[in-house]
Amino acid sequence: MTPQTRTPVVPEEELERLEACAADGIYSAGVNTVTNLYSAKIFRRWWKGSSVLEMGCGDGNTTRILLEDFDDVTVIDGSRALADKVAGEFPGVTVVCELFERWEPGRTYDTIVLNHTLEHVYDMVQILECAKQWLSPEGVICASVPNARSLHRQAAVLMGMLPAEDALTPSDIRAGHRRVSTPESFRAAFIQAGLRIEHSGGYWLKPLSNAQTDEWFTPEMNDAFMALGERYPDIAAETYVIATH
């Protein structure tokens, strides 16, 4: 049974919010696409089994990679526009358009992927509790979110452009983010949800804003700085967790 909703999420308002974020298209171009693909590259080291649930599909870039490794792919997203896009591009995928808080799959999955999803939800622990119930006994959860201690956020605070490292920027708000986690607060959510953390880390050493990166960085530079973040996870732009029961 799915845990009872303990948050003030109003379904109609939340669905409208998700559609507005999807219509903006902020994740469909530039370095945002690069970072989501790099997340999938990292997750690929740990995901397992033949079935996968992708919680939050974005524009389908991660879905495409999942189809290379899994026979049974299910995607759930609250945005009708994004769900229809993925269903149209990948006819072999089971696509569900619903809020996580209201869904009951009636089955479990070997791997569950939340690629830059948890920063959007109202209650991160509640959603992880749902994911735990939907995870097979030997399964794995792979999740990533932006890191509040990113080098570029620390620089923004020193320059007076951001009041605190975990403050929401205009880009965060535009993308529908509700929080910016530290590595510690992100890991704490998994522990509170009753999950076991097998590995955590970071990627993308990010000295500049997304707009500056899109303007000045070559693909080779993006690749290098994504990888450098794995060497310096505490100040990387993205933080991730690999968790099990």
Give names to the regions the model predicted.
Residues 1-107, 111-115, 128, 202-205, ...:
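Conserved N-terminal segment of class I S-adenosyl-L-methionine
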Residues 116-120:
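Short catalytic micro-motifs in class I SAM-dependent methyltransferases
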